[in-house]
Amino acid sequence: MPNIQNGKTGKWIKSEEELPAFPECVFDHLPSFLNEVVNNSISLDDRDTILIGAIVCLSVCFHNICGVYDERIVYPNLYLFVVADAGMGKGALTLCRELVAPINRNLHELSKRLEQEYKEAMNAYIKGKKDGGMTIPTEPPMRMLVIPANSSASSFLKILGDNDGIGLLFKSEGDTLSQTLKSDYGNYSDVLRKAFHHELVSLSRRKDREYCEVSNPRVSVALAGTPEQVRKLIPDAENGLMSRFCFYIIRFKRGIRNVFATNDISQSKNAMFKLLGDKFCHLHEEFVRQGNYSFSLPSDLQEHFIEYLSR
């Protein structure tokens, strides 16, 4: 956070005026799809927010890619919190959800079909129960990609388990998640901390004789909120979530942009991102069909990484 001193190290975090935007060289080398995405931005802060938001939302879809970091297998998943005062443009993050909406919708439709088949099978089982020889049908998994941020802890783990440990927590108001984590039924902060490192997560409730376990979770998180909402979610630096989140802070600016730039619904940001979501859905289907991938940095970039972070 800007203008907040780290009392233990004595170092000052950069002031809000010093916070940089992503350099132009980043945008000069984007993949073609991401280039289409950021071309819908209306300012530098908007472009940065859309880029990092898109990367985080798409990261949950690349569960077939892994690499080795610090001698451990890692996946592309990231945790993001876009921080800004009210009315400063953090709402651009909501557009990024449209990029994965078709995939989420397809999974919901699959769940409905499986649920209907299950009900029909159960009816047949009940009618033929007296005859014997019939096996009780198994309840189908609840398939989805985007997990509601107000889910209870057991529901969160159940949904993860139903989806092979894959899920995106997306909320444009970060206090929804912080309120959920503070409640008795929804405190899965520990699950999020472990899921970041793809560690086995589990939950046991004695009252309901309930036990949930998910191995190799691959969870991405995209949140937006005000500085106060960050403090509610992560009260201090000792909280383990602090080191797991990427924070992008939108600087305070006076004035108003032209909110009447277009009157054409087909040219609205909503319409453009829905088209991009449909395009990504097709790209994703083809990508997953190709199989699994492993990623590693070239040795010269590994050396540059170590050298840079050793300064």
Positions of predicted regions on the chain:
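Phosphate-handling catalytic cores of nucleic-acid transaction enzymes
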Residues: M1-R311
